[in-house]
């Protein structure tokens, strides 16, 4: 007679056995905070981009996490061009909240892109840690009444600093020093997408 309590050594392992619960929980917290999971993160101590272990975890166990989040009512999306992952909500209430967050992100990215293009610089520099937005840029944008009005319409009452912080908290932008910012691969991808849509309109 078989002992039901003893594990069978020849049984196939579940994909859950391959991922530590602490790692799954860390990923879940990132997504719940509205962040995208980018391939590289900015390390302030080393002043360079470093590999994101959570990105590698998702990439190496993609099938497992797609199924896992599907059971939670979400769609795990991998964007190959921008090298990042994000969650799409499936319920109407959450989709509405997602739309508002997406709108606010788009407003900030469009303002940054518009300002950068007007200053005669190539948008690609926005994704470089040694370039991006500097102190003079922040002062100029913060003094522009039109920009501030647009930001207020998107519910950024405190102006540019609140808007930039909104992107930083979502891994769409990094702060590389005092009054210095640059777009992550995900932030740059979304900006390029917005520019393409604008040019086709």
What are the roles of these predicted feature ranges?
Residues 2-98:
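Eukaryotic partner-binding/assembly regions in large regulatory complexes
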Residues 38-53, 126-151:
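Short acidic, hydrophobic short linear motifs in intrinsically disordered regions
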Residues 57-65, 150-169:
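Short amphipathic alpha-helical interaction segments
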Residues 67-72, 77-132, 136:
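Short basic alpha-helical hairpin corresponding to helix-turn-helix/winged-helix-like nucleic-acid-binding
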Residues 71-78, 164, 168-178:
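A short, conserved structural fragment
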Residues 83-91, 174-201:
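Accessory beta->alpha helical hairpin/"wing" motif in late/C-terminal subdomains of nucleic-acid enzymes
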Residues 129-134, 156-163, 183, 187:
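Short, conserved alpha-helical segments within structured domains
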Residues 149-154, 174-178:
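Short conserved catalytic/interaction loops centered on acidic-Pro-aromatic/His motifs
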């Amino acid at each position: 007679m078989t002992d039901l309590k003893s594990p069978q050594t020849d049984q196939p392992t579940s994909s859950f056995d391959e991922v530590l619960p602490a790692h799954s929980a860390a990923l879940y917290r990132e997504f719940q905070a509205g962040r995208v999971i980018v391939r590289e993160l900015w390390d302030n101590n080393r002043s360079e981009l470093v590999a994101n272990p959570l990105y590698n975890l998702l990439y190496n166990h993609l099938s497992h996490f797609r199924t896992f989040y599907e059971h939670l009512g979400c769609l795990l999306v991998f964007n190959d061009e921008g090298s990042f992952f994000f969650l799409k909500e499936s319920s109407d209430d959450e989709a509405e909240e997602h739309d508002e967050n997406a709108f606010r992100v788009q407003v900030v990215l469009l303002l940054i892109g518009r300002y950068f293009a007007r200053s005669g610089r190539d948008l690609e520099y926005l994704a470089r840690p040694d370039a991006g937005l500097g102190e003079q840029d922040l002062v100029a944008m913060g003094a522009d009444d039109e920009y501030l009005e647009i930001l207020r319409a998107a519910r950024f009452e405190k102006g540019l600093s609140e808007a930039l912080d909104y992107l930083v908290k979502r891994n769409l932008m990094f702060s590389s020093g005092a009054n210095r910012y640059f777009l992550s691969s995900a932030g740059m991808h979304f900006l390029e997408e917005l520019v393409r849509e604008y040019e086709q309109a």
